[in-house]
């Protein structure tokens, strides 16, 4: 049976260019957590050292969207389209085909971007980590990649190359699909209304209306601003010793300076009274509009990075909505104000906790009894 490893570093210890900031045994997880900082570049490392052959290497950046053009999402795609050391068109798909990775991905969140790879073969993990490190810090980011991933003009009919041109692009097309879903559209309307003074009110994935406003220069500047070691948070998990990760990073972080420090993300100032939002969405011309209304109440409730806040909201959500007999769920179902519940309960939006109660298949004149 796995046991919790003994600590191998001590607070204030210096190792491979890093200083140990904190060491925390985690008996429930059979792991020891090490928090470290690279002294030259300012990069931070969190390693959960456990007796587990499944090792994970992840590079993470706070990337709050500056607007609705989808810069974080487009950049996530673009950095994995060739780098200085690996100048192939799609190294991401080459890794999927050729490595023994148990997990490999890249993800854009509300306010951050993640690049995780996992493998239970150490040599394979180091190869994957080297490709990912070079991809995020030294991508090619040429105009062809920008046009392909963000937007470009293409014939509406591929068989008629001289015909009408329409906007295309990988992220553009992906987000058109997202925005065509009424429930996805509703979630974005709610976020914009709930966070008017915060990056969480902006579309990190990209609004198809705004994506064509993005310029190549803004794209390059976004990488220079956010994809710097001083803004990087490295996360490791598994039985590879901490010192090996630090040696790997220190060699590649040579020459970087702190360049300011990590990006701070502002939270939404609280209001003194509720706000009402009414928003329409398109349906097919022949589609019956009866009971196509969504009714939603949503609150800002606390700090999702505060363990107590997060736990209390999770428990409250379970008590009120967590099963068929839960009082709020039962009351909403038995009210017959809508066909079913919609995305209800505790939800994290970056650093913010929210609580939402929603119904779908309703009508506008049922709003007052719903509230």
Indicate where each model-derived feature is located.
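Charge-rich, well-structured scaffold segments of protease-associated domains
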Residues: 2-16, 64, 78, 82-273, ...
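Short pre-active-site segment immediately N-terminal to the catalytic Zn-binding motif
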Residues: 60-70
């Amino acid at each position: 049976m796995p046991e919790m490893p003994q600590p191998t570093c001590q607070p204030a210890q210096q190792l491979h260019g890093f200083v140990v900031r904190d060491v925390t045994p985690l008996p429930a997880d059979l792991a020891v957590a090490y928090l470290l900082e690279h002294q030259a570049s300012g990069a931070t490392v969190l390693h959960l050292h456990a007796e587990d052959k499944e090792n994970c290497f992840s590079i993470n950046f706070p990337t709050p969207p500056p607007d609705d053009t989808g810069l974080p999402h487009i950049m996530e795609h673009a950095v994995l389209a060739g780098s200085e050391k690996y100048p192939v068109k799609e190294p991401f798909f080459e890794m999927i085909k050729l490595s023994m990775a148990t997990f490999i991905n890249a993800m854009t969140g509300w306010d951050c971007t993640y690049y995780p790879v996992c493998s239970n073969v150490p040599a394979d993990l180091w190869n994957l980590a080297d490709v990912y490190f070079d991809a995020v810090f030294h991508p090619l980011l040429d105009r062809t990649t920008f046009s392909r991933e963000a937007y470009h003009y293409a014939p509406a009919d591929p068989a008629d190359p001289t015909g009408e041109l329409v906007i295309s692009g990988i992220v553009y097309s992906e987000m058109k699909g997202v925005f065509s879903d009424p429930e996805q559209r509703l979630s974005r309307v709610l976020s914009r209304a709930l966070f008017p003074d915060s990056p969480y009110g902006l579309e990190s994935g990209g609004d198809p209306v705004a994506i064509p406003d993005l310029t190549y220069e803004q794209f390059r500047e976004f990488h220079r601003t956010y994809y710097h070691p001083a803004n990087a948070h490295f996360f490791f998990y598994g039985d590879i010793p901490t010192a090996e990760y630090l040696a790997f990073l220190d060699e590649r972080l040579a020459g970087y300076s702190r360049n300011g420090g990590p990006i701070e993300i502002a939270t939404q100032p609280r209001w003194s009274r509720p706000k009402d939002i009414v928003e329409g969405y398109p349906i097919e011309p022949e589609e019956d509009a009866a009971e196509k209304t969504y009714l939603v109440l949503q609150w800002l409730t606390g700090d999702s990075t505060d363990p107590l806040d997060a736990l209390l909201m999770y428990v409250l959500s379970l008590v009120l909505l967590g099963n068929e007999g839960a009082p709020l769920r039962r009351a909403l179902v038995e009210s017959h104000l809508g066909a079913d519940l919609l995305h209800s309960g505790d939800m994290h939006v970056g650093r913010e906790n929210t609580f939402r109660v929603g119904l779908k298949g309703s009508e506008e004149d049922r709003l007052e009894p719903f509230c």
